[in-house]
Design a protein with these regions (language model features):
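Short, Lys/Arg-enriched, disordered terminal segments
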Residues: 1-4, 302-305
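ABC transporter nucleotide-binding domains
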Residues: 2-5, 12-188, 193-207, 211-213
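Short coil/loop linkers at secondary-structure junctions
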Residues: 67, 108, 123, 248-249, ...
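Solvent-exposed alpha-helical segments within well-ordered globular domains of core cellular machineries
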Residues: 77, 169, 173, 194, ...
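Hydrophobic alpha-helical segments typical of transmembrane helices
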Residues: 78, 97, 112, 174, ...
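Non-catalytic alpha-helical coupling and interface elements of nucleotide-dependent molecular machines
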Residues: 103-106, 300-304
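ABC transporter nucleotide-binding domain
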Residues: 173-261
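Short, charged/small-residue-rich alpha-helical element at the C-terminal edge
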Residues: 226-298, 305
Length: 305
């Protein structure tokens, strides 16, 4: 698969404070990549580096094969970006907004505007003033604006902010359609983890400036679903026994409970081992966690943002 975005050992320090610390990840052609992290984790700083607003202190960023530090203009041409709510002129029509932006890009052919309008399904309302649009329609117009330059990578920062459930679903379906029909890669920064779970193919989790995980959403959800909670006595003896099984991972104690990751199919086998070793089993249950639960665990339960 072709790499549309590649970060390698990227760091950013301002006035001696490290905001982003040696992060590396890739985004491939035709995929939706979610970027998650709590407040102050380094998400905004990373996005500012991706779109060329600030330069990395260390490391390299490549966009569609163009190194940002040596081929800045070529790299930036490959990106379309919306940071939260798109910047639009409410007193102009949707068409006039797109036409103004097209002029800035040197686009003189109305066919390109018509193409993106049809793509975001705004043809019936494109000649109405933007101030009459719903927030969801404004998001779609903003995406149309970002697509005018035919980018290979679309960066959306908190795209669902302010949208009602219907608007969120509409945006999610549109992103999937966009990727399928145009083979565009989409990079989404968001704090709505349930949405990331439904929209994205892969996810990168950043905390305190460091990447703590890059994985497929499918694998993360599977991992979360394999958590098992044990209530046993004596606790330490049970922990020692669990540690002898290499297939049982991430063994932790919380409020006299033992939490671990293991196949639910092994529960009966472990119960038999506990009984044989005179360990009293008071309770056991599988944890049907969500991606959000796993995220909170990875980031120390910090507030999302």
């Amino acid at each position: 698969m072709n790499k549309v975005l590649k970060l390698e050992g990227v760091s950013k320090s301002i006035k001696g404070k490290v905001l982003v610390d040696q992060i590396s990840f890739e985004v491939y052609e035709g995929e939706v990549f979610g970027f998650l992290g709590p407040n102050g984790a380094g998400k905004t700083t990373t996005i500012r580096m991706l779109v060329g607003l600030i330069a990395p202190s260390k490391g390299t960023i490549e966009i569609a094969g163009f190194p940002v530090n040596t081929h800045f203009k070529e790299a930036m041409k490959q990106i379309g970006c919306i940071v939260e709510n798109p910047e639009l002129y409410g007193y102009l029509t949707g068409w006039e907004n797109l036409n103004q932006f097209a002029r800035m890009l040197g686009i003189k052919d109305d066919k390109k505007i018509i193409e993106v309008v049809n793509l975001v399904k705004l043809s019936e309302r494109i000649h109405e003033k933007v101030k009459t649009y719903s927030l969801g329609m404004k998001q779609r117009l903003g995406i149309a604006q970002a697509l005018l330059g035919r980018p290979k990578l679309l960066i959306l920062d908190e795209p669902t902010n302010g949208l009602d459930p219907a608007g969120i679903r509409e945006l999610r379906e549109f992103i999937h359609l966009l990727v399928k029909e145009q083979n565009i890669s989409v990079f989404i920064s968001s704090h709505l983890l349930s949405e990331i779970e439904m929209i994205c193919d892969r996810v990168g989790i950043i905390n305190k400036g460091k990447m703590v995980r890059v994985s497929t959403v499918k694998d993360l959800v599977k991992e979360a679903a394999e958590r098992v909670e044990w209530r046993v006595s004596p606790t330490q003896k049970a922990i020692d026994l669990l540690k002898k099984d290499s297939t049982i991972q991430d063994i932790n104690v919380k409020d006299d409970l033992i939490l671990c990751r293991m196949s639910p199919l092994k529960i009966n086998e472990i119960i038999q081992c506990f009984v044989t070793e005179d360990i009293q089993v008071n309770g056991v249950k599988t944890m049907s966690d969500t991606l959000e639960d796993l995220f909170m665990e990875m980031t120390g339960g910090e507030v999302r943002g």
